[in-house]
């Protein structure tokens, strides 16, 4: 498995991460087999959130690996907090309580990475800074990041937060590539030129923040998977051509497209199918040519000026 450095930290992580949002769909034996396979393949970075399965996903994961200090040393654990029923909450009290709950469910005494899940309109950076400082001093969290945040929101946090923001988890796929399209279509009068995220892609590259694409196979907001969809015939034809050329599956090509971008992204793979996970891992050893990358981009309906 190819590795990358997470943001500006010294943490070396796999080029793809395992998303655990759906691990509660597996029984204990299936969960054990899935996590064991991931570890054997070098995919030892696991992404969680306190809301996944109402907390059950973290508990199921810990039981599946029979969490103990030896097992814990072999993996990198990331979780997220800040989403509550009907609201978002970045208060110091909620962040600290959330981390304690996460650690209890995961049966560990520290997280490698904590992300703030979705922007809180009522965020007070000073409060977040106090929470981060306390978590760092106590050893409960080693690195910090965000999810679904634009450059100004990150800079607002950094006004008070002294720890580096090492990751930003963002929705990104071949068919959900507005952050790429707006950069390509600068100074053009078309829908693709509309900048909806404050140039977050370039911002993250400038500030050594690793982008973690979530839902890398989805189109729209959980409308469906583009692979094999009759809504994207040209895209699937092109992906299938490349899959045949590289002797891999279409799943591998979809992830290879993200990894070809020089931003050094770390896609979050949400599948609970071990074979599909292996296909995603194979993408770390494939480098699409520049021409192939653009062919896939255009086949998805994205335009060039």
Protein language model features and the residues they cover:
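Active-site groove signature of glycoside hydrolases
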Residues: 103-124
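Beta/alpha (TIM)-barrel catalytic core signal, keyed to glycine-rich beta->alpha loops juxtaposed to Asp/Glu
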Residues: 125-305
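Acidic-and-aromatic substrate-binding clefts and catalytic sites of carbohydrate-active enzymes
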Residues: 23-29, 49-59, 84-89, 120-124, ...
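Short, acidic/polar
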Residues: 26-38, 90-106, 152-155
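Structural motif corresponding to the early beta-alpha repeats
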Residues: 71-93, 117-118
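N-terminal binding-site loop/beta-alpha segment at the start of enzyme catalytic domains
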Residues: 1-75, 137, 218-220
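Conserved beta-strand positions
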Residues: 18, 48, 79, 113-116, ...
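A structural motif
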Residues: 43, 108-111, 141, 165
């Amino acid at each position: 498995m190819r590795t990358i450095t997470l943001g500006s930290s010294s943490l070396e992580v796999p080029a793809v991460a395992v998303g655990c949002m759906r691990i509660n769909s597996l029984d204990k034996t299936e969960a054990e087999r899935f996590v064991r396979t991931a570890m054997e393949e070098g995919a030892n970075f696991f992404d969680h959130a306190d809301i996944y399965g109402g907390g059950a996903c973290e508990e199921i994961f810990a039981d599946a690996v029979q969490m103990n200090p030896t097992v814990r040393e072999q993996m990198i654990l990331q979780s997220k907090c800040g989403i509550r029923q009907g609201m978002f909450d970045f208060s110091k009290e909620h962040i600290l309580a959330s981390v304690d709950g996460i650690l209890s469910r995961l049966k560990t005494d520290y997280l490698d990475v904590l992300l703030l899940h979705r922007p809180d309109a009522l965020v007070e950076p000073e409060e977040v800074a106090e929470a981060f400082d306390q978590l760092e001093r106590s050893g409960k969290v080693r690195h910090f990041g965000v999810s679904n945040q634009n450059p100004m929101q990150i800079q607002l946090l950094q006004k008070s937060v002294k720890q580096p923001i090492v990751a930003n988890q963002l929705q990104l796929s071949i068919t959900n590539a507005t952050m790429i399209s707006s950069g390509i279509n600068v100074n053009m009068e078309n829908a693709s030129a509309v900048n909806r995220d404050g140039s977050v892609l370039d911002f993250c590259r400038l500030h050594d923040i690793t982008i973690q694409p979530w839902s890398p196979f989805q189109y729209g907001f959980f409308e469906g998977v583009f692979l094999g969809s009759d809504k994207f015939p040209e895209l699937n034809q092109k992906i299938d051509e490349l899959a045949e050329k590289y002797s891999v599956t279409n799943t591998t090509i979809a992830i290879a497209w993200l990894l070809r971008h020089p931003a050094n992204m770390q896609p979050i793979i949400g599948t609970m199918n071990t074979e599909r996970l292996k296909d995603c891992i194979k993408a770390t050893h494939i480098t699409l040519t520049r021409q192939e990358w653009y062919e896939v981009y255009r086949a998805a309906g994205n335009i060039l000026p």
